[in-house]
């Protein structure tokens, strides 16, 4: 049975940042999907790709700023200066701000690729259970593989973490660190997205709208050529429709976008993020 000092579960930004601080001999990182990035996700649609997870990120820490500066210099990240809007009385309006925003280049998962350049990741490896093994921990994968570790860092959403840690008293974490869902729908868009005053917009926060949480025009981001629109639904709407078929979600959101912006769209796909973000943002 293989052994490592530190086992890291999840190759999203948190897992990659932790791995970057460790000697390569001291850790193994397990990622259930085919590549790094976590919710910095993009998906191929026809001949192009669209960001279906986080639409941008901001910087609030000088250490992270240094990382972002390096990623920009290497071509993996670029600033994004969209014409911002929001919803007021359920209507789209311009709402410019001075917030510095960044996106992966050419897609959001490029930041994950940058952070993982010198990190070996065991992809398509889902950890099913973590159990005590003397003064160590034993990790059991769905593939049947197992290994031991002196320390385990779990970066998965809390509900998935609790399921892995059935041998430990962590059940209370499920309610303390609850996560909200988000339905994401990608639509075709062959004309500008405009606010109620006729001004073209690149992205909108949901404001007081009951369905829309965030909307982004893909080709407003540097490096994107696709005529696609990405819509995140609100946590409340997503929870209400959580178990519905993705085709039904696509049609509901397509109708809402078409009615709100008076544009003709075609639904391309919908993706359910069951654990999109913390219910209580004080833990972010």
Summary of predicted features, one role per range:
Residues 3-29:
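N-terminal Rossmann-like FAD-binding beta1-loop-alpha1 element of flavoenzymes
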Residues 251, 258-284:
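Flavin (FAD/FMN) cofactor-binding core of flavoprotein oxidoreductases
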Residues 56-62, 92-114, 243-252:
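Short beta-strand to alpha-helix junction loop
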Residues 20-45:
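Glycine-rich FAD pyrophosphate-binding loop
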Residues 42-85:
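N-terminal FAD cofactor-binding segment of flavoenzymes
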């Amino acid at each position: 049975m293989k052994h490592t000092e530190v086992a890291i579960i999840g190759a999203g930004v948190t897992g990659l940042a932790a791995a970057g601080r460790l000697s390569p001999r001291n850790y193994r990182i397990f990622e259930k999907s085919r590549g790094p990035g976590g919710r910095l996700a993009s998906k191929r649609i026809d001949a192009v790709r669209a960001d279906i997870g986080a639409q941008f990120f901001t910087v609030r820490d000088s250490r992270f700023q240094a990382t972002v500066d390096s990623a920009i210099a290497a071509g993996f990240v670029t600033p994004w200066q969209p014409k911002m809007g929001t919803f007021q009385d359920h209507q789209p309006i311009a709402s410019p701000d001075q917030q510095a925003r960044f996106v992966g280049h050419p897609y959001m998962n490029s930041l994950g690729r940058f952070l993982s350049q010198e990190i070996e990741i065991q992809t398509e490896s889902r950890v099913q259970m973590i159990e005590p093994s003397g003064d160590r921990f034993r990790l059991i994968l769905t593939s049947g593989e197992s290994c031991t570790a002196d320390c385990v860092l779990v970066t998965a959403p809390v509900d998935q973490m609790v399921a892995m840690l059935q041998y430990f008293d962590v059940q209370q974490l499920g309610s303390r660190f609850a996560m909200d869902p988000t339905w994401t729908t990608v639509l075709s868009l062959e004309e500008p997205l405009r606010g109620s005053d006729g001004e073209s917009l690149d992205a909108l926060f949901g404001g007081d709208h009951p369905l829309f949480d965030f909307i982004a025009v893909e080709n407003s981001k540097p490096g994107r050529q696709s005529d696609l629109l990405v819509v995140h639904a609100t946590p409340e709407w997503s929870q209400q429709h959580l178990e519905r078929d993705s085709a039904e979600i696509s049609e509901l959101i397509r109708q809402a976008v078409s009615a709100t912006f008076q544009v003709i769209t075609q639904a391309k796909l919908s993706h359910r993020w069951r654990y999109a973000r913390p219910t209580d943002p004080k833990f972010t």
